[in-house]
Amino acid sequence: MTNPISQAAGALSQDELKTLVGQAALQYVAPGEIVGVGTGSTVNKFIDALASIRHLIKGAVSSSEASTLRLKALGIPVFDANEVAELSVYIDGADEIDGHGNMIKGGGAALTREKIVAALANQFVCIADESKLVQTLGRYPLPVEIIPMAAQRITQQFAALGGRAQVRLKGDQPLVTDNGQILLDVTGLQISDPLAFETLVSQWPGVVTVGVFAYQKAQVCLLGTARGVKTLTF
């Protein structure tokens, strides 16, 4: 169901829409809690907004080194995931989200830690602009974190599904994740059953994390649109 928040957006830029949903996410942060914080440009807007209420919360669990640095720079304490039994909420963006709350994530290369923090949370609130809402996942290249020695085999397995996998580069070298592994970006997929797809790929030897979030899907999405922020619930 949808519940538009009455906040006119006018002709806002994509960056301004990100700011809008980042600020709107504060309504899901309870005083005295430790907040799960994702990674990416939209989440950066949430972190900036979170700084305005840092005196009301205990701190955050972060899904990446980049988010940790930003949180600490703004005076927000950061806890290790192993110090926290559970979180009331996890706030993160998405590269794609469908009408059931399933997502593709990992454009910021933090998908493994994002799944770990999401699994600790009782509620996943996705913040995104309306360009990320799709009918079927797969238009955005699917990130998959893998152990390097498995790259050739996993590339072949994706080819059998109609996908084309390429190692993500940073400059002329493979990008290395915060976990010391590499990423494949897979194009040409139409993921009509995200839960089954996540189950299948997660079983392949050498896969650390696949960027389909169906087991850890969103319960809420704050979607920035030309008409304001829409709240989607799943």
Curated annotation (Swiss-Prot):
<comment type="similarity">
    <text>Belongs to the ribose 5-phosphate isomerase family.</text>
</comment>
<dbReference type="InterPro" id="IPR004788">
    <property type="entry name" value="Ribose5P_isomerase_type_A"/>
</dbReference>
<dbReference type="GO" id="GO:0006014">
    <property type="term" value="P:D-ribose metabolic process"/>
</dbReference>
<dbReference type="InterPro" id="IPR037171">
    <property type="entry name" value="NagB/RpiA_transferase-like"/>
</dbReference>
<feature type="active site" description="Proton acceptor">
    <location>
        <position position="114"/>
    </location>
</feature>
<feature type="binding site">
    <location>
        <begin position="39"/>
        <end position="42"/>
    </location>
    <ligand>
        <name>substrate</name>
    </ligand>
</feature>
<feature type="binding site">
    <location>
        <begin position="105"/>
        <end position="108"/>
    </location>
    <ligand>
        <name>substrate</name>
    </ligand>
</feature>
<dbReference type="Pfam" id="PF06026">
    <property type="entry name" value="Rib_5-P_isom_A"/>
</dbReference>
<comment type="function">
    <text>Catalyzes the reversible conversion of ribose-5-phosphate to ribulose 5-phosphate.</text>
</comment>
<protein>
    <recommendedName>
        <fullName>Ribose-5-phosphate isomerase A</fullName>
        <ecNumber>5.3.1.6</ecNumber>
    </recommendedName>
</protein>
<comment type="subunit">
    <text>Homodimer.</text>
</comment>
<feature type="binding site">
    <location>
        <begin position="92"/>
        <end position="95"/>
    </location>
    <ligand>
        <name>substrate</name>
    </ligand>
</feature>
<comment type="pathway">
    <text>Carbohydrate degradation; pentose phosphate pathway; D-ribose 5-phosphate from D-ribulose 5-phosphate (non-oxidative stage): step 1/1.</text>
</comment>
<keyword id="KW-0413">Isomerase</keyword>
<feature type="binding site">
    <location>
        <position position="132"/>
    </location>
    <ligand>
        <name>substrate</name>
    </ligand>
</feature>
<dbReference type="GO" id="GO:0005829">
    <property type="term" value="C:cytosol"/>
</dbReference>
<dbReference type="GO" id="GO:0004751">
    <property type="term" value="F:ribose-5-phosphate isomerase activity"/>
</dbReference>
<dbReference type="InterPro" id="IPR020672">
    <property type="entry name" value="Ribose5P_isomerase_typA_subgr"/>
</dbReference>
<dbReference type="GO" id="GO:0009052">
    <property type="term" value="P:pentose-phosphate shunt, non-oxidative branch"/>
</dbReference>
